[in-house]
Design a protein with these regions (language model features):
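Cell-envelope and extracellular/periplasmic
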Residues: 35, 72, 82-100, 116-120, ...
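N-terminal catalytic cores of peptidoglycan-degrading enzymes
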Residues: 1-85
Length: 227
């Protein structure tokens, strides 16, 4: 499958800071806090100089507008990890300057929409948040799965900040619900037999959370009935 860029992009300023075409297919998304209430244009501007030795695939400005800094086909320099960035779409999001590096609703809503778009174009129906570094980095996603990772797992940083970190489960649930992976997947309980408890909850939890919003049935009740 060929690589494409998001149609949500309204501004493009390509950075020279990248490693060329990826050596791994896209199966991760890594959202970051840019540490500043920057515009979409300013985020790209941070990465135009080769002396910076950093970049990202997309930026989300403080008003929610999306910019393209490194084409999706190319590996950006964003997460302090070659292995992660080879397979992840990296997104720098406008945020406050200090912990918890909060993001406004326009930025968060755009992040949800951008993740939905990235998953759709890359053939994914489920976005997973496992919430644990070792489990995530050792997890082999199914062909229709995308996994969230964070910069703090690869460097001594707070990124993406505690504000977004606490909402990554919600991000995964919203994206998975929009992708419709739950009702059409035909998932059976037996498909979870080789997963740890944390992996099983991460895989099916967002599906039942999304179902709760439409049916009113508590997610824990639906999950218990499923298992």
């Amino acid at each position: 499958m060929g690589y494409t860029n998001s149609p949500l992009v309204v501004y493009t300023k390509l950075s020279p800071n990248h490693s060329g075409q990826r050596t791994h297919s896209i199966d991760r998304i890594t959202p970051h806090c840019v540490v500043g209430q920057l515009s979409a244009e300013s985020i790209c501007g941070c990465f135009t100089s080769t002396s910076r030795q950093a970049s990202c695939n997309y930026g989300i400005g403080t008003d929610g507008r999306v910019s393209l800094c490194v084409e999706e086909k190319n590996r950006s320099w964003c997460s302090s990890s070659n292995a992660n960035d080879q397979r992840a779409v990296t997104i720098e999001c406008a945020s406050d300057m200090n912990e918890p590096y909060a993001m406004n609703s326009a930025v968060y809503d755009s992040l949800v929409k951008l993740c939905i778009d990235i998953c759709k174009r890359n053939g994914k129906k489920n976005l997973l948040w496992l919430g644990d570094k070792n489990k995530t980095l050792n997890y082999a996603p199914a062909a229709d799965e995308m996994v969230l990772t964070v910069h703090r797992w690869f460097a001594n940083k707070s990124c993406p900040g505690n504000w977004l970190y606490a909402r990554l489960g919600d991000l995964a649930a919203r994206v998975t619900a929009a992708l419709g992976g739950s009702s059409s997947s035909g998932m059976q309980a037996s498909s979870l037999k080789n997963l740890s408890e944390a992996e099983a909850v991460a895989k099916i939890g967002p599906l039942f959370t999304a179902n709760q919003k439409t049916t009113g049935i508590l997610a824990c009740v639906s999950m218990a009935q499923f298992i």
